[in-house]
Structures are given as C-alpha cells and as structure tokens.
Amino acid sequence: QGDVETTFCLPKPTGEEEKFLKIIGMNQVPVVWRDVNYDYLKSRLPDYTSPEEYYSFRDHIYADFSYMHVNDLGCMEFAGGYPKNLHEEINNYSIIAGVVARRQEFDIIHAHDWLTYPAGVHAKMVSGKPLCIHVHATDFDRSRGQVNPTVYSIEKNGMDHADCIMCVSELTRQTVINKYHQDPRKCVAMHNAVYPLSQDLQDIPRVEH
C-alpha cells in the first residue's frame, strides 16, 4: 500500500479481492499457445485480466507444455483448497510463475507459504530478483515431528534459495535454523500483528468497569 505496488498471483481469484492489489489469476495465464481472437477473450476473461495482458503472457511461454492438461485458452485450471493432486497443482503453479516472471517488472518476490516456494524459486531463477519466503509453520510443527519427506524437501529447497526467511515466531525461526540448516543471518522473526491505534483513538478515555 502507499508507495508499494503489489502484484498478487492467485491460483483461482474470486473477483472479491482488495482493489489496491494488482491481481493476476494464474488460471488465466496461458502456458500453451492458442490462436484466440480478441472478442472471444473479452467474453472469457474476468475483469482483472485484459486480452492485451493475455497476449503478452502468451508471448512469454518459455517451453513446450502441450503435454499438460489445459483449457481452450491454453491455461491450466486449479481446483483450489487442498485437492488430492496437491503436489501436481504446486508444480503447475510454479510453471505459470515462470511465464509471469518473464513478463512482469518487480523488485522482490514474496512466497507466502510452502505451497508457493517452488514458484518463488522459479521466479527468482528467471528474474534474478531476491526471494523472501514466509514461514507460518514447518512440517515439523504440522506433523508433530513425523515429517513428510516430500513436503520437507519443498520447504528446504525454498529456504535454501531464499534471500530472506520471515518466521512468525522465534520458535519457528529456531526450527528453520536447526531442522532445515539455514543461516541464522537470513532468518528473522516477524510476529503476526495488527497496526497500532492512531493517537486520537489512544486518547479516548477507557471505561472503568
């Protein structure tokens, strides 16, 4: 907000997102070239994606993904939530991130959780821009120590490539350092918080009960 421009890459936007963000629906980014006319695109794309943007993304498809399951626009669909093919959707999201990173101009990449770490790593490799990942919890926390090796591998690869690792607590930071063998200098604890009250609200007398 303010002097920060944020591009928010969502797998499956609802159309109800905050307007101060630039929304990119990853399910509207083509990965397979399709010859689609302008009027048809206007009828198929949501308000937050223009035909011009679609064509621009189409020009930045970087590999042959014709073996992937795509729709009539050459885009991949996402189930949303935590489907049975979750790891496939994580991989698909990272493929699309490669197209987006080749098209967009930005200063820093933020990967919100382990599901988006592969996409963040891909965007960093494409752009050379720094990657900051957010760690709300690790698989050590979620599994009570019975770690899923696939999830651990995704988490660690994201951490290894990250320039900054934001942890929601000092406990999480220590887990990242000790269990994922990360450099303490790039791990910071940033607690979930709210904005402080403005002074005029702080000056309102408290009611004594």
Residue ranges and their predicted role:
Residues E89-I96, K129-C132, F140-N157, P196:
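Nucleotide-sugar donor phosphate/pyrophosphate-binding loop at the beta->alpha transition
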Residues I108-H110, Y117, V121-D141:
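Active-site proximal beta-strand in glycosyltransferases
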Residues D200-H209:
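Nucleotide-sugar donor-binding and catalytic loop/hinge architecture
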Residues G98-R103, M125, N148-I165:
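Membrane-proximal helix-turn-helix segments that form the acceptor-binding/catalytic region
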Residues L171, A193:
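Carbohydrate-associated surface elements
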Residues I109-H110, D160-E170:
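A short beta-strand/loop micro-motif in the catalytic core of glycosyltransferases
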Residues P11, V135-T138, H191-N192:
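Histidine-centered beta-alpha loop that forms part of the nucleotide-sugar donor binding/catalytic region
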Residues E5-A101:
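A conserved catalytic-core segment of Leloir-type glycosyltransferases
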